[in-house]
Amino acid sequence: VPLHANSRKVIIMNAVEITIIVVAAVLLLCGILFGVVSYLVFYEVIARNSKIPGKMDANAKKKMMETNPEKFLLDPREEWLNDQTFENYSITNVDGNKLKGYLLKADKPSDVYVFGSHGYRCWGKREFRLMAKFYHDLGFNVFIVDHQAHGESEGKYIGFGSHESRDAMQWLKFMTDTFGSDIQIILHGVSMGCATVMMMSGNPDLPKNVKFTVADCGYTSPWVEFDYQLKNAHVPTSPLLDGANFFNKHIAKYDFKKVDAVESVSHAQVPMLFIHGTKDDFVPTYMVHELYDACSTDKDLLLVEGAGHAESYPTDSAAYEAKVKSFIDKYIAVESKA
């Protein structure tokens, strides 16, 4: 064989080896980059915000009040709530996190308790700053919680209804043990808090004390919600969401796909009142129709015209209250009403 042919073969083999090494290196770098980005998505969405909600640097707040004072004008109902005295309670969940709950007692003795479940990156008193007065004026007790990794409660990771519904079931046991085994409970959740109470409503262990659920602007599942948000941002869903879910399953210990409110309401144990704004572009309005159609128990639906996400109550308080009162009239014992 001529020498130049052997040389050519060596050159070709070297080129192939170099190509394989380069391709392997590129794939490795892509894998590392994918892992890093997936983890960052997981951490940004699921990990607790480092700042405690409601706390603002005094100088920053003063500057904002000077430049944009209308942002600090409180609704009279919120001002009223700020003047009320709450009883503080706590439980420790199965993860070892101390969770906080706050009771606004009715002016007169009542066996009706509204369990308030707040949304993502919010906290109890903030979410129910307007609605608390409505229920209090009806003569009901209002019990508001801070979910894990929110407000004054401990915890590192947000469960999007998975951990929160588990913890809320523990809160219900605490309530019946503390306030009476025969109390009547109304579940009321907003956004992620809505997903929480929907999952509770389909739990076969839901106590008979729960009389009905108000489900305000909840998503069908976090997987579908994240898919919707990524597509809106023109970001490819796959494999990014799969990667984030991989970290979520191993770190936060739940699967985005298995937090399924549609499945839960299909086994609902109590009547359900679904509420959603027609202009909700965060949790799109179509989701409430899927949830309503899947619900297996007595149900009703209120669509609030022009309301954005979690804005149905301030947008049309009268319609909202009227629909809730219709459920109260139907499902709460007469002697317990205001």
For each predicted feature, which ranges?
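An N-terminal hydrophobic leader/cap segment in hydrolases
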Residues: L27-T92
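Conserved alpha/beta-hydrolase
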Residues: Y135-E154
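Catalytic histidine neighborhood in serine/cysteine hydrolases
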Residues: D293-A310
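Catalytic active-site module of serine/aspartate enzymes centered on a nucleophile-bearing elbow/loop
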Residues: T315-A338
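The serine-hydrolase catalytic nucleophile loop
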Residues: Y120-F134, H147
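Alpha/beta-hydrolase active-site loop
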Residues: I158-F179
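Hydrolase active-site cap/lid region
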Residues: M199-D255, E263
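Short beta-strand/loop motif that positions the catalytic acidic residue
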Residues: H267-A268, F274-H276, D280
